[in-house]
Amino acid sequence: MTKIILTDIEGTTSSLSFVKDVLFPYAREHLPEFVRGHRDDTEVKRLLADARAYAGGDLDEEALIERMIGWIDNDQKITPLKALQGLIWEDGYARGDFQGHVYEDAVAHLRQWHQQGLRLAVYSSGSVHAQKLLFGHTAFGDLNPLFEAYFDTRIGGKRDTASYKAIAKELGVEPREVLFLSDLRAELDAAAEAGMKTTALDRAGNGEDFGPHPVARDFAGVGV
């Protein structure tokens, strides 16, 4: 019996284009000024130190900014960078520069499942902070009350089976009691290997090969 629905964000609850065409370019454009303006903030200072350590060199501020922009351009899932992006997006949401995109069908079914007593959680490569910002600033209002837990790369990579086992343990359930939703087969494979149930979201309807995983065009097609 399914007790928890664990959902991805990009390409699943939300448009890939929102992340790639709105959020990433916004963070890239505003990263230099944000770092220069907040370098002495305790959290930013810690994240910059973590990013510098990850880069493996004693980079000065401008070189580090350039390196991080390169990471953004290559869509690298680096934890301190993701956290910095989240802080930049927080400013953007607060200024009303954009709203978090969530598909209407996703909102309707997340609300329905929540009302039915199903527990809901999120697992995305974006930081937990960024996840909460996206769901907190949508055209449908603040959706965060629907979710009980959020997971990012701090628990492990999304293509690693161990990550899904760790999530189930954190949620206090057996993996078989979790239904994972994603648009990427490698993530679905890892979740299934951990023992979770899975459904692939094929919003583009491209007939992508999702192998043994059930496929839905939108949340209305997800069987729980």
From Swiss-Prot:
It comes from the Bacteria. InterPro entries: Enolase-ppase_E1, HAD-like_sf, HAD-SF_hydro_IA, HAD_sf. It catalyses: 5-methylsulfanyl-2,3-dioxopentyl phosphate + H2O = 1,2-dihydroxy-5-(methylsulfanyl)pent-1-en-3-one + phosphate. Its cofactor is Mg(2+). Its EC number is 3.1.3.77. GO terms for molecular function: 2,3-diketo-5-methylthiopentyl-1-phosphate enolase activity; 2-hydroxy-3-keto-5-methylthiopentenyl-1-phosphate phosphatase activity; acireductone synthase activity; magnesium ion binding. GO terms for biological process: L-methionine salvage from methylthioadenosine. Binds 1 Mg(2+) ion per subunit. Bifunctional enzyme that catalyzes the enolization of 2,3-diketo-5-methylthiopentyl-1-phosphate (DK-MTP-1-P) into the intermediate 2-hydroxy-3-keto-5-methylthiopentenyl-1-phosphate (HK-MTPenyl-1-P), which is then dephosphorylated to form the acireductone 1,2-dihydroxy-3-keto-5-methylthiopentene (DHK-MTPene). Monomer. Belongs to the HAD-like hydrolase superfamily. MasA/MtnC family. HAMAP family: Salvage_MtnC. This is Enolase-phosphatase E1.
